[in-house]
Structure formats: structure tokens, C-alpha cells
Regions:
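Bulky hydrophobic segments
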Residues: 2-108, 112-115, 121, 125-143
């Protein structure tokens, strides 16, 4: 890899990290808001949650949560793919997927749902599998 490619690669990784951090802030705001921000804008009713597709596994896994956590997790895995940070980002993503859903016990107009928690975790796992399958490798493992 020549010097220009390394610089370009570093810039891309920095951009992905930036998008990951901004996405996390937005996720936390949307998750902790008492009601549905999307429902407020789309339906003019904060009590209605828009549904992208039907839920998975006979309504046991929230499709919206799977999609969101696939995207955010993939950004995290790409941005923090170095061997030293990969364990931390993986732990963080599983932690945040559980923690944010548990916070719904304490937020008015929100409620803990097992299918949402399952969707969060499935999203992280699917993203991790996709990342590990397609990740470029060096001789000694991670980049």
C-alpha cells in the first residue's frame, strides 16, 4: 500500500468514526425521548411508531431495531477494526443495545419490549458476522 492509499484509508476511517459518533448521539436521543420522534413528524402523533417492515420471527424480533443496530454496529466495527479497539467496540455495542432498552423502564411513554431488545442484539450480531466475513485481513489477524 503506497503512502497516498494509507492517507486516504486513514481519512475514510476518521470519517466513519465521526459518522459513528454522531449516529450514537442521535440514537441515544431517539431512544431516550418519551415517545416517537418519527411518529411526531410523520403522523403528527408521538405515540405512533412508524414501521419499516413487518417484524421478524413471528413478531418476536423488531425489524426497525435490527436495521438501526446493523447500521450503527457496522460503522463501529469499520471505524474501530484495529485489534486493540475491536474488543471494546464489540462490548460497547452489546452494552448499549441492552442498556438503552432497559432505560425504557424509567422513561415516560416508553416501555421495555423483549422484541426490541432481541432486535438490538440481532442487529449487532448480524453486523458482526458480515464484518468478519468481508473484513480485509493481514497476516497477523486484524488490520
Amino acid at each position: 500500500m503506497n503512502n497516498n492509499s494509507k492517507i486516504r484509508s486513514k481519512k475514510i476511517v476518521h470519517f466513519v468514526k465521526f459518522v459513528f459518533h454522531i449516529s450514537n448521539i442521535i440514537l441515544i436521543i431517539f431512544y431516550l425521548y418519551p415517545g416517537s420522534i418519527f411518529g411526531c413528524f410523520i403522523y403528527n402523533d408521538c405515540g405512533i411508531q412508524p414501521q419499516l417492515t413487518r417484524d421478524f420471527a413471528s413478531n418476536m424480533i423488531s425489524s426497525n431495531h435490527v436495521y438501526v443496530f446493523i447500521i450503527i454496529s457496522f460503522l463501529g466495527f469499520v471505524g474501530y477494526s484495529k485489534k486493540t479497539t475491536f474488543k471494546y467496540i464489540t462490548t460497547y455495542l452489546f452494552f448499549i443495545s441492552v442498556f438503552l432498552e432497559l432505560m425504557h423502564f424509567a422513561i415516560p411513554e416508553r416501555g421495555f419490549e423483549t422484541k426490541d431488545l432481541a432486535g438490538n442484539i440481532v442487529g449487532v450480531v448480524v453486523s458482526l458476522i458480515i464484518f468478519l466475513i468481508f473484513k480485509p485481513r493481514k497476516k497477523n489477524g486484524f488490520i
